Amino acid sequence: MASFDFIDEVKKYVQAGHGGPGVVHFRREKFVPKGGPDGGDGGKGGDIILKGNKQLSTLLHLKYRKHIVAEDGKSGEGGCRTGADGTSIILEVPLGTVAKDIDSGNILVDITEDGQQTILLHGGRGGQGNVHFKTPTQQAPRHAQPGESGEEGWIKLELKLLAEVGLVGFPNAGKSTLLASISAAKPKIANYPFTTLVPQLGVVAYREGHSFVLADMPGIIEGASMGKGLGTRFLKHIERNRVLVLMISADDTANIVQTYTSLLKELKSYSEDLFKKPRILVISKLDLIGAEEKVTIKKLLPKQIDCVFISSVTGEGLQKFKDKIWKLLHPELK
C-alpha cells in the first residue's frame, strides 16, 4: 500500500437525524361531528453507526467525505399514524478503529470485530402527536411535540492496527527483511532509512497449524515520542500489540547498548503501558558479523535481557525467534 493511501486518522463533523414532529390532527368521520384528536407521533431520526469490515485497511474512503448527516424522522400523520424513521448512516471502518470525541478525548466506540455494529450517535426521538394530550378537561388539544434533536459533534476516527506482535527499531534495523522472510508479506526493502513508510502486517505460520500476526512499523528516531520523524503517528499502532520485538542491527556492535536504551526511552516517554509490555530483543543481520563479535555483543548486554540472534538472509535463529514469541504470547503453556 502506498503511503498516501494509508490514512489512519480522519476528523469529521457528524450529526444524527432529528426526530420528526408530532402532528395536530382530528378525526374526520362521517356522522361523527366531534371527532377526537388522532395526531400521530413523529418518526425517529437516523443513527450514525460504525461497522467493522475486515477487508478495509485504511480510512482513506472517509478522508474526503464532507459532513456526515443522517436523515431526519418524518412528521406524524392523522389516524394515529407514526411518521417514518430517518435512514441511518453506516460507516464501514477497518478493524482496530476507535472513535473519539474531539473536545474531551473520550473513546466513544472501539471496533475490533468483523461485522460489529455500534451506534456512534443516536438519532432524536420523534415528538408526540396531539392524541397523547387529550384530558377530561381538554378534549381537543391543539398542540403536539416537536422531535428531539439528534446527537452531533466533531469526532476523530483513529486506526490502531490489530497485530499481536510489533517490530520496533531505528531505521535499517532489518525489520522489513524479517517480516518478508517469515510471512507472505511483501514490504519494500532497500538499504536506506525510512524504506517503510506505513505499517505492514504479515501472518507468521507456527508449529501445528498455529500462527500469529506480526506488524512491521516504520523506523523511529530519537524523539519519536515527542513527534519527531514519523513520531507518534505510528507509535500508537503498537498500543494494541501484546508483545514487542526491539530490533537492533548486529553490524553496529559498539552502540548496541546505547541503541537498546534509546528504544526503551522512546517507549517509556510515549506510554508507561508500552514500556511494561512483554518484549524481546532481537539482534539482526547475524550473517554480517563473526563469532567473536557475537560473543562481544553478549558480554555488552545485561544478562537479564532476553535476546536472540537472527539472520533473515540465512534463516539462522528464526525458529528460535518464533518459539520465544509464541511463549510470550501464551505464557500459560510454559
UniProtKB/Swiss-Prot annotation:
Its main location: cytoplasm. One of its GO terms (cellular component) is cytoplasm. Mg(2+) binds at S176, T196. Coiled coil: none annotated. NCBIfam families: Obg_CgtA (TIGR02729), PRK12297.1 (NF008955), PRK12299.1 (NF008956), small_GTP (TIGR00231). Residues 163-330 form the OBG-type G domain. GO terms for molecular function: GTP binding; GTPase activity; magnesium ion binding. Monomer. Keywords: Cytoplasm, GTP-binding, Hydrolase, Magnesium, Metal-binding, Nucleotide-binding. Belongs to the TRAFAC class OBG-HflX-like GTPase superfamily. OBG GTPase family. This is GTPase Obg. An essential GTPase which binds GTP, GDP and possibly (p)ppGpp with moderate affinity, with high nucleotide exchange rates and a fairly low GTP hydrolysis rate. Plays a role in control of the cell cycle, stress response, ribosome biogenesis and in those bacteria that undergo differentiation, in morphogenesis control. InterPro entries: G_OBG, GTP-bd, GTP-bd_Obg/CgtA, GTP1-OBG_CS, GTP1_OBG_dom, GTP1_OBG_dom_sf, OBG_GTPase, P-loop_NTPase. The gene is obg. PANTHER family: DEVELOPMENTALLY REGULATED GTP-BINDING PROTEIN-RELATED, MITOCHONDRIAL RIBOSOME-ASSOCIATED GTPASE 2. It comes from the Bacteria. GTP binds at residues 169-176, 194-198, 216-219, 284-287, 311-313. GO terms for biological process: ribosome biogenesis. The lineage of its organism: Bacteria, Pseudomonadati, Bacteroidota, Cytophagia, Cytophagales.
